[in-house]
Amino acid sequence: MAKLTKRARLIREKVEVTKNYDINEAVALLKELATAKFVESVDVAVNLGVDPRKSDQNVRGATVLPHGTGRDVRVAVFTQGANAEAATAAGAELVGMDELAAQVKAGEMNFDVVIASPDAMRVVGQLGQILGPRGLMPNPKTGTVTPNVAEAVKNAKAGQVRYRTDKNGIIHTTIGKVDFEAAQIKENLEALIGALVKAKPAAAKGVFLKKVSISTTMGAGVAVDQSTLDDAK
């Protein structure tokens, strides 16, 4: 039998797998168990009461977290003219059209988010096989295809997270860093939950928020008692 690591033993001792923790207790646990030599991210998994096989029950969108994610986000914008100037002024690292597309085709993708104005989709559409598998393809539902590219850049820089149900109907995203204040992690999680509730498909029946779990990059999931979250009550 494989020997448990010190961290695995600590998780086994501290985390009750069948318990739903008060959000403040859950965050305190994450902080206690975050023993990696780097600042771990705080991730969330939300099990939704949807049938992901049905297109009218897919949940997809974006929301700006009040305290950001703790990451420096590099933004690429496909646009031209006045929009290009506005995107640059808003802080985008890469702005262009065909020349930017050529960089992507050459494998030069030093960015985390891609935004496009509607008139640029003729160029971006050619990059679907490259951007799509990486989760970078712009989409109107996530606010990354928009005539107001400057606002989209500001949102990305401010800590916007994009979410989408996976094949099991689960949303996975990051809501901060383990060195955030506990209240900041809680408020970021509540902002995400509030956005998900607003995005509930009309076709989804029964309990929508089935389970909420938070974890750190190297840690185990801790189930959260939803009644302790303001936007999940």
From Swiss-Prot:
SUPFAM superfamilies: Ribosomal protein L1. The keyword Oxidoreductase does not apply. CDD domains: Ribosomal_L1. It comes from the Bacteria. Disulfide bonds: none annotated. Keywords: Repressor, Ribonucleoprotein, Ribosomal protein, RNA-binding, rRNA-binding, Translation regulation, tRNA-binding. Pfam families: Ribosomal_L1 (PF00687). One of its GO terms (molecular function) is rRNA binding. GO terms for cellular component: cytosolic large ribosomal subunit. PANTHER family: 54S RIBOSOMAL PROTEIN L1, MITOCHONDRIAL, LARGE RIBOSOMAL SUBUNIT PROTEIN UL1M. Binds directly to 23S rRNA. The L1 stalk is quite mobile in the ribosome, and is involved in E site tRNA release. Part of the 50S ribosomal subunit. HAMAP family: Ribosomal_uL1_B. This is Large ribosomal subunit protein uL1. The gene is rplA.
